[in-house]
Each structure stands twice: as C-alpha cells, then as structure tokens.
Curated annotation (Swiss-Prot):
Designated name of the protein: Zinc transporter ZIP9
Membrane-spanning ranges: 11-31, 75-95, 104-124, 138-158, 172-192, 214-234
Residue positions the entry lists as glycosylated: N2, N169
tRNA-binding listed as a keyword: no
Single annotated GO MF: zinc ion transmembrane transporter activity
One of the GO biological process terms: zinc ion transmembrane transport
C-alpha cells in the first residue's frame, strides 16, 4: 500500500512540473527563433562596415546625445530583462504549487507574448541603429532571463517557502510586476523613441521629447483596466 502511494506521488510530480519547465525552455528557444528572422532584415555586410565606422567616429563618441541614445537602448533592454525575470519568478512559483490550472495559465501567457516581445526588442534596437553583434548579445540576455529565474525560483525554494508563497499568491504578484515593467518600458522608452525623435534621428535641444498627455493617459488607463476587470473576481 505504501509502495503504491509512493509510486503515485512520484508519477504525479513530473506531470505538475512539466508544463512550467517546458514553458521556461520554450521561451528561450522561441526568442532565439526570432534571431534568424531579424538577421534577414538587417543590412548587408557593406552597410555593417559603414555602421561600425559610424560608431568609431570620435565626434559621435564625444557627443552627449549619442551617449544618451546608447543609454536609452541599454535601459530598454534592462527593463525587458527585469520583465522576463519576473516572468521566470512567476513560472517557478507556479511550478511549486499543486494547482494545475495556474501552471497552465502562466504557461500560455508566457508562450503567447515572449516571442513578440523579443521581436519587438530587436526591432527597436535595429531602429535605434545598434549593430547586429550587440543586438544578439541583448537578445541572448533577454532570452535567458525567464528560464534561468524560473529554475532558480523553483529549485531555491524550500517546502515551507513554497507554502508561504502559495498563501500570498506569489504567482499573481510576480505576473503583476512583470506586466508593470512591460508597460513602463513600452510607454516611457520605446514609444517616445519610435514615435518622436526616431523618425528624424535628430534630437531636439531639450534632449528628447517627453511623454504627451495622451501617452500618460494611455499608460494610466492600461494600468487601471486590469484593476477594474478584477473587481468582483476575488477568490
């Protein structure tokens, strides 16, 4: 009787954990699949040489606007890495619970948006004029953030910690944090760059265009809609 119970328990563990681990590794491979598509859209080798000469220009290296643009690219990548890391924490927390429905929801949510997010990151970096080698490095860091954090979260939690996280709904909190970072990066960094100074490639004297009232309203509305929809659905 004990042997049968132990066998059943051990056979259920892989079933519960498998979707989350499969999602974590699939996220990494999905993002890597974007790389060949982006390489096909990048300039030729001759244009790459021109880009390298452009980045080696001492006038541009000493230009504060060029430095600001470089910092913007790094900040955008860093924000999306934090977003992906939060996805990984949510994934690891979901895998540590016995709620199969939560695991499935997190799995589907991450699979649906990870590849478009990676493609958007690469498109933004290409639009900003970053060379292909640096784009690959940015993409690699972004693609590894979710699976690495999911495994660290799952393997680093003790049994008592998993129970405590389950009580405070750590998966939901991590997903909320992930969504917030994504909204912040998209609204504060990507949209102003693409919709404002990105078309002319000539920043104004103030160092770039700030957010308009409409953009701020859209950001606030995007934050409030999930809160409004969640009213009356507390479990």
């Amino acid at each position: 009787m004990n042997m049968s119970t132990a066998t059943t328990t051990h056979s259920c563990v892989p079933i519960l954990v498998f979707p989350s681990y499969w999602a974590s590794f699939s996220c990494c491979w999905w993002t890597r699949l974007v790389t060949p598509m982006c390489i096909l859209l990048t300039p030729t080798q001759c244009e790459d040489d021109e880009d390298e000469n452009l980045y080696d220009d001492p006038l541009l290296l000493n230009n504060p606007e060029a430095a600001r643009s470089s910092n913007s690219k790094t900040t955008t990548t860093l924000g999306l890495v934090v977003h992906a890391a939060a996805d990984g924490v949510a994934l690891g927390a979901a895998a540590s619970t016995s709620q199969t429905s939560v695991q499935l929801i997190v799995f589907v949510a991450i699979m649906l948006h990870k590849a478009p997010a990676a493609f958007g990151l690469v498109s933004f970096l290409m639009h900003a004029g970053l060379e292909r080698n640096r784009i690959r490095k940015h993409l690699l860091v972004f693609s590894l953030a979710a699976p690495v954090m999911s495994m660290v979260t799952y393997l680093g939690l003790s049994k008592s910690s998993k129970e405590a996280l389950s009580e405070v709904n750590a998966t939901g909190m991590a997903m909320l944090f992930s969504a917030g970072t994504f909204l912040y990066v998209a609204t504060v960094h990507v949209l102003p760059e693409v919709g404002g100074i990105g078309h002319s490639h000539k920043p104004d004297a103030t160092g770039g265009r700030g957010l308009s009232r409409l953009e701020v309203a859209a950001l606030v509305l995007g934050c409030l809609i999930p809160l409004i929809l969640s009213v009356g659905h507390q479990h």
